[in-house]
Swiss-Prot record:
InterPro entries found in the cross-reference section: Pyrophosphatase, Pyrophosphatase_sf
Biological processes annotated in GO: phosphate-containing compound metabolic process
Function recorded in the entry: Catalyzes the hydrolysis of inorganic pyrophosphate (PPi) forming two phosphate ions.
Organism whose genome encodes this protein: Thermus thermophilus (strain ATCC 27634 / DSM 579 / HB8)
Cofactors: Mg(2+)
Protein name in the entry: Inorganic pyrophosphatase
Gene behind this protein: ppa
Length: 175
């Protein structure tokens, strides 16, 4: 089986990228791709009454500041399955820090979903949806503080900043 982390980033990158889905929208389970197993495995069950507000995964052939592929949250009409590779239109960036350092999340939409064609930049995402995303990431590790886990959201950035982050992570991956 191919290493999902090294799949192509996509021919239209950085505007449209491939994203490997690890966690479907609505899940209270945190799944992660394990390249040693060649499979997506359960990392943990979120300890609170929380669920992912979008489909969560990573952009292959990228390297973020934390040493992992660049994370992303995808807005979709219907939940996507773990292991699916989806073309995602990059629309914004959520800047965060956690116990490991910088941990930005690309925000995107399914590129081939006409219901989402109107979302081109983070300003097009309804305010309530952005608040839900921010609240999730601010609190999803709160009950794990005794284990040294924490998160701080430092702000939202527009599509231009998100594209710059994707470019930087592609360049870092290439070395």
């Amino acid at each position: 089986m191919a290493n999902l982390k090294s799949l192509p980033v996509g021919d239209k990158a950085p505007e449209v990228v491939h994203m490997v889905i690890e966690v479907p929208r609505g899940s209270g389970n945190k799944y992660e791709y394990d390249p040693d197993l060649g499979a997506i495995k359960l990392d943990r069950v979120l300890p609170g009454a929380q669920f992912y507000p979008g489909d969560y995964g990573f952009i292959p052939s990228t390297l973020a500041e934390d040493g992992d592929p660049l994370d992303g949250l995808v807005l979709s009409t219907y939940p996507l399955l773990p292991g699916v590779v989806v073309e995602v239109r990059v629309v914004g960036l959520l800047l965060m820090e956690d116990e490991k350092g910088g941990d930005a999340k690309v925000i995107g939409v399914v590129a081939e979903d006409q219901r989402l064609d109107h979302i081109q930049d983070i300003g097009d995402v309804p305010e309530g949806v952005k608040q839900e995303i921010q609240h999730f990431f601010e609190t999803y590790k709160a009950l794990e503080a005794k284990k040294g886990k924490w998160v701080k959201v430092t702000g939202w950035r527009d599509r231009k900043a998100a594209l710059e982050e994707v470019r930087a992570c592609i360049a870092r991956y290439k070395g």
